[in-house]
């Protein structure tokens, strides 16, 4: 049975499929505006970054489709699990990312959600989608590397 990969101590959620589906060209750290029940739910590990993306609207950046499960003890104060959340960045950073996304084929995707000094942060990646043959090529290269590593390990 394969070992389950352990997350680094501050990591709350990770978009592992993103590196398979996209070529990540640049990364940037952003804060995220959350409600009380959202941060409590995230600290419990109930966040999912799959299929989420960021976009610039009216000079502000928003994170869409990030699922945060409702907090069990939140009763009527609970949040909408798929609500659009505002990302906290400097104006120059937002403009730079906006310019990159206007180029055809680029998008901004969240790679990781983590805590830093008690604050929830999102690692965003400026990415270009991979074609199906690119994904196959990457899997072949990974398999070849694994075989080489096994052969070298068996030798010693």
Swiss-Prot record:
Domain of life: Bacteria
Keyword Cytoplasm applies: yes
InterPro entries: SmpB (IPR023620), SsrA-bd_prot (IPR000037), SsrA-bd_prot_CS (IPR020081)
GO cellular component: cytosol
RNA-binding among keywords: yes
Principal location: cytoplasm
GO MF terms held by the record: RNA binding
Entries under Pfam families matching the protein: SmpB
SUPFAM superfamilies in alphabetical order: Small protein B (SmpB)
UniProt subcellular location: Cytoplasm
GO biological process: trans-translation
Similarity-based family: Belongs to the SmpB family.
Function noted in UniProt: Required for rescue of stalled ribosomes mediated by trans-translation. Binds to transfer-messenger RNA (tmRNA), required for stable association of tmRNA with ribosomes. tmRNA and SmpB together mimic tRNA shape, replacing the anticodon stem-loop with SmpB. tmRNA is encoded by the ssrA gene; the 2 termini fold to resemble tRNA(Ala) and it encodes a 'tag peptide', a short internal open reading frame. During trans-translation Ala-aminoacylated tmRNA acts like a tRNA, entering the A-site of stalled ribosomes, displacing the stalled mRNA.
UniProt-recorded name of the protein: SsrA-binding protein
Gene that specifies this protein: smpB
């Amino acid at each position: 049975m394969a070992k389950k990969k352990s997350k680094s101590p501050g990591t709350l959620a990770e978009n592992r499929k993103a590196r398979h589906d996209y070529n990540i060209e640049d990364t940037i750290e952003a804060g995220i505006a959350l409600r009380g029940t959202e941060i409590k739910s995230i600290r419990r590990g109930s966040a999912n970054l799959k299929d989420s993306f960021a976009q610039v609207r009216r000079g502000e950046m928003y994170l869409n489709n990030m699922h945060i499960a409702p907090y069990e003890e939140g009763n009527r104060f609970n949040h909408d699990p798929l609500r659009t959340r505002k990302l906290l960045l400097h104006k120059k950073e937002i403009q730079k990312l906006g310019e990159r996304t206007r180029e055809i084929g680029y998008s901004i995707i969240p790679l990781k959600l983590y805590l830093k000094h008690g604050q929830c942060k999102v690692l965003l990646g400026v990415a270009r989608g991979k074609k199906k043959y690119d994904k196959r090529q990457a899997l072949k290269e990974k398999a070849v590397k694994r075989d080489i590593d096994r052969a070298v390990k068996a030798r010693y």
